[in-house]
Amino acid sequence: MTEKTQADLDLLIDEGLNAEKGELDLARHELEDDDVKAIFQSDKIKGVTALFLEFNKISDEGIRALLDCENLKHLTALNLFKNEVTDAGVKEIAKSKTLLNLSELVMSDNKVEVEGAQALAESKTLSNLVSLWIGDGLGDEGAQWIAQSKYLTRLNLLSLYRNNIGNAGASALAKSSNLSSLTELNLNWNFIEADGIEAMAKSKTFTNLEQLTLTYNPIGVRGAKAIARSENFKNLKLLDLYE
């Protein structure tokens, strides 16, 4: 890949910046840590409240540069889908005072595992989140951390797709007293079976759900029947069970 010059990066900012909406779209440019470090030093990004960095090559070093950037201290939305952030980067995000206004965080298809999930769950900084996408190695234990968090209580949307979550993780979500505001739950590409689905179907936690996606989970006929018969899922408007 050709190394990007400062002129290249300035052009990307100019092309991706919507000053009126406070948005900066830098998705799909194969940006690496050094690239975003240079971008974050630019005065052009002052006033940005929504930053889209999906489909790049940003790792923990780039995250640290983002958190040190004075121009991004008013972010309300951060999309890091499909990058290379690990638990270490998530821990930095979780303890940062830069992101106190953040309401939307997308970190699916990164390298986040149990320690990252724990850091998110214990973060006062992220207590204003209403939308969280995280992955992709949480497993049942990571799901349990999210479920029991006393700070992630405002979530309307939670995406835990492709996280190796099984019945134990699904049951933990079902037992959560902190996720009752959820209207959208994405559990695609996991390993949840009928037992996990039955636990969810019996749970009052999910009475506000309007969208539930369970594509590529081995729930079987018993799991499908549990959903169909559940009074707690009566508000569903979208249900995806494709195997």
Name each model feature, range by range.
Residues L24-L31, L51-K57, L78-E84, K95, ...:
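Concave beta-strand-loop units of leucine-rich repeat
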Residues G16-E23, D43-A50, E70-A77, K97-E104, ...:
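Leucine-rich repeat
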Residues D10-E15, Q148-S149, K175-S176, N188:
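A broad, low-specificity signal for short, low-complexity segments enriched in glycine/proline
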Residues A38-K44, A65-N71, G89-T98, G116-T125, ...:
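C-terminal per-repeat helix/turn "cap" of leucine-rich repeat
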Residues M1-L12, K21-L24, E141, A168, ...:
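C-terminal capping region of solenoid repeat domains
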Residues E3-L9, E30-K37, K57-R64, E84-K91, ...:
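Short, solvent-exposed loop/turn at the beta-strand->alpha-helix junction
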Residues T2-D68, L75-A77, F81-E84:
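LRR N-terminal entry segment and analogous cap-like coil->beta motifs
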